[in-house]
């Protein structure tokens, strides 16, 4: 059974039953849920939609393709056929709404334990037999924030932690860094990103079917159009956005395609990074001090980038595109024209930039992060992270430019092609729902091995 479903290329057998229809008083208001689209933690909502909603109407997923979508292939309404049970609990969304109302005071909890999580977990235990039958071991809860379930009281955590967690931060370093990650119990999933999952910027409007940059973004890459389609629940990364197919458009496509066949633009920029440097009081707790190398420093540790060393920073290099931020469409254009994406840590080892890089065909560069640094990446048994990324240890972070320039064209192309053909499967999207298929494979392995958290395992 599980030897088949866990074999490469085989369709996983486990079904995920969304049998829990929480009563209205235990559901988050629709206004809160819609607001959480703008949260970096909304992977919990995206995973739920992939199971419970039909593929997007704009998708070409019909026939066999639709049958392979998680909504059809990995969900059953019959609990007797279910191997695992998905709990529609969204505490990250609850806290995001709480922090918005509190002016981003992230120590606020807005009674998330007593008002939301504990009543919902009590209902699941008392209204359904499935939790008690397994001690919760065959139940799935999503915890997409940096410190997993560390935001909640011990009583709340005890009510949840016999289940399998789907987490975005996998860290096997000694405490305190890896305190909340359970190596043999949790499954690491991708984070959502603002660029793709909030603003619905479509990479295929900036790169062609092979992952090479378009001479100009397609007409559908219009931010006004995306705002008009803001109600769509899913981003698109595999097909270009639909455009008007009138005569003028068809003629334009003909000449554009003719031009693209003559000359495919190359990625002209070597490396890209968008992000900040933390606070002066953070020291090396933020980014292990690595990001201070990216920006010019006057040697004053009290001013950004908070370094005691004087240097011009990678931002001064002509083939490094380093900045605090960019407008979304400008950032998308730059991603499409860049070879490598820098991935230093922040407060944790993971970075949402990774999934933007993969979606745009940019080769990720783990700097002080990645498996060699103690980071657990999503679906390591099924995804060849080594073959589509570069890993640079922290003590060689200052050598990033020379290391990247030493990579041969052939090696870069191998990694770029693997990113495009394999890496995009790890990005949260709605057309294919590959993330759920990868989750199912890992659940299959856990079931085969008899791994079950049980009430005796706690997050300490």
What are these regions (language model features)?
Residues 70-74, 126-129, 205-207, 254-259, ...:
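Eukaryotic intrinsically disordered and solvent-exposed regulatory patches
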Residues 11, 77-83, 133-136, 262-266, ...:
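Extracellular/periplasmic catalytic domains that process cell-envelope and extracellular macromolecules
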Residues 229, 235, 240, 264, ...:
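Donor nucleotide-activated moiety binding/catalytic core segment of transferases
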Residues 110-265:
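Catalytic core of nucleotide-activated saccharide and alditol-phosphate transferases
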Residues 3, 28, 93-98, 133, ...:
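Short catalytic/ligand-binding loop motif for oxyanion handling, primarily in non-cytosolic enzymes
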Residues 1-140, 144-145, 428-460:
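N-terminal pre-catalytic "stem/leader" segment of glycosyltransferase-like enzymes
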Residues 24-25, 90-94, 145-149, 172-173, ...:
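Short, solvent-exposed loop/turn segments at secondary-structure junctions
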Residues 330-427:
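Catalytic binding pocket for nucleotide-activated donors in carbohydrate/polymer assembly enzymes
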């Amino acid at each position: 059974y599980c030897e088949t479903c866990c074999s490469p290329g085989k369709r996983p057998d486990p079904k995920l039953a969304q049998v829990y229809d929480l009563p209205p008083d235990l559901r988050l208001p629709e206004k809160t849920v819609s607001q959480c689209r703008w949260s970096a933690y909304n992977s919990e909502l995206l995973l739920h939609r992939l199971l419970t909603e039909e593929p997007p109407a704009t998708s070409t997923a019909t026939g066999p393709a639709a049958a392979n979508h998680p909504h059809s292939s990995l969900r059953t309404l019959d609990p007797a056929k279910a191997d695992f049970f998905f709990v529609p609990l969204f505490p990250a969304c609850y806290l995001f709404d709480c922090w918005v109302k509190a002016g981003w005071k992230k120590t606020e909890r807005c009674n998330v334990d007593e008002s939301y999580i504990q009543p919902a977990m009590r209902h699941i235990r008392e209204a359904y037999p499935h939790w008690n039958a397994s001690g919760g071991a065959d139940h799935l809860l999503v915890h997409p924030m940096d410190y997993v379930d560390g935001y909640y009281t011990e009583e709340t955590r005890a009510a949840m932690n016999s289940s399998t967690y789907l987490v975005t931060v996998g860290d096997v370093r000694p405490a305190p860094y890896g305190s909340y990650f359970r190596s043999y119990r949790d499954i690491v999933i991708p984070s959502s990103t603002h660029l793709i999952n909030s603003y619905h910027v479509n990479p295929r409007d900036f790169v062609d079917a092979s992952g090479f940059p378009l001479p100009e973004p397609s007409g559908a890459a219009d931010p006004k159009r995306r705002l008009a389609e803001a109600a769509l629940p899913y981003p698109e990364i595999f097909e270009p956005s639909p455009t008007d197919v009138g005569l003028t458009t068809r003629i334009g496509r003909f000449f554009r395609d003719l031009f693209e066949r003559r000359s495919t633009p190359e990625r002209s920029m070597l490396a890209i990074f968008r992000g900040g440097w933390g606070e002066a009081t953070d020291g090396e707790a933020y980014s292990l001090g690595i990001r201070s190398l990216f920006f010019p420093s006057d040697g004053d540790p009290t001013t950004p980038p908070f370094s005691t060393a004087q240097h011009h920073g990678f931002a001064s290099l002509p083939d490094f595109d380093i900045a605090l931020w960019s407008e979304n469409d400008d950032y998308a254009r730059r991603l499409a024209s860049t070879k490598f994406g820098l991935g230093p840590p922040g407060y944790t080892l993971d970075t949402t930039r990774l999934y933007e890089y993969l979606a745009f065909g940019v080769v990720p560069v783990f700097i002080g992060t990645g498996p060699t640094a103690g980071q657990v990446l999503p679906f390591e048994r099924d995804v060849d992270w080594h073959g589509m990324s570069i890993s640079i240890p922290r003590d060689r972070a200052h050598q990033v430019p020379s290391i990247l320039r030493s990579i041969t064209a052939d090696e870069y192309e191998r990694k770029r092609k693997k990113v495009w053909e394999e890496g995009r499967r790890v990005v949260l999207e709605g057309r294919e729902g590959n993330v759920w298929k990868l989750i199912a494979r890992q659940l299959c392995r856990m079931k085969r091995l008899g791994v079950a958290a049980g009430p005796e395992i706690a997050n300490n």
